[in-house]
Each structure stands twice: as C-alpha cells, then as structure tokens.
Amino acid sequence: QTALGLPAPRASWQPAAFGENLSGLGLTEAQACIGDVYRLGAALVQISQPRSPCFKLNQRFGYSHLSQVMQLTGRCGWLLRVLEEGRVDPVDALLLMDRPYPELTVKRTADILFNQARHEGDLQLLLEKPALSPNWRQHAAHWLEHGVVADWRRRLLGPAEFQLPPKA
C-alpha cells in the first residue's frame, strides 16, 4: 500500500488477501503476457485475461477507491485457465513453456480496455488473440462496434449501499 500512497489497510495484504487462488513473487503484469503457457507442478496453465478488480477489495481493505487505483495502475493480476490438470505444491516453480503474444502484456491488455482512449488498432489486436478470454474479446468488440466503452462503475464501486465514504 505504501507504493500506492495509501494509509494502513483494514486487512493485511498477504497471499490470498485479494481472493486469488495462486500467489507468487517476481512476475508482474508488465512482464506476463496474454497466452503465456506455464508448467506449474504437474499442471499446465495459460494466462487468459487481466483480473478486473471489483468493489469487494474496497470493502475488505477499507479504501473507498482501491479497485480504481488497482485498475489505473495496472496492478490487477491475471486469470489462468487450466490446460492440463495436475498436482501443484507450494514449492513448485512457474516455468514458461510458450509465449505466443510477447507484444500483449497483461498490463497493456488492461490499459487498452481500462485506461486509454479508444484506439481501433489496439482493440482489433485484442480481438485477434484467441487465448484472450471470450469476455474480454466481447468488451473489445463492443467498444469497436459501438464506440462506447463499458461502464465499469458498478464493478469498481459496487451498489450504492456498499460504497465506502472516501478516507480523509
């Protein structure tokens, strides 16, 4: 939280605190790419999309706009699809097996939909990547077709009854 300029949180920032099933050290959104295939223990997994932060993070940590800060900074994490099931142990290393789209980092993907002005070439790039989740490709197609980005406010801030007042 210090790097983001936030005061001490309501809950501890530790592995699984953000609702993730897997946590690791060292690999960032600026390094990991959509479509990356990793061997993790006996499992084979693939990065399918950036994580879309939601208002539940605001509630858990006591910051009214933590989800927005995460989205704006691109520090959201990512989702993995399982290509091959297998046992995974806490000591297993994440081994990169394939990187089909080195030009499409998780951060760049998130920035295209969340943080930059509409750019047809970038939206088309998302549509052309079958490893990107169908949901994210749908968002890109909608923005490309209708010229309007999705309204993220409900996801980021939640229903009115869940919104926290800003911290002073």
Outline where the language-model segments fall:
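Metal-cofactor-dependent catalytic cores
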Residues: 1-168
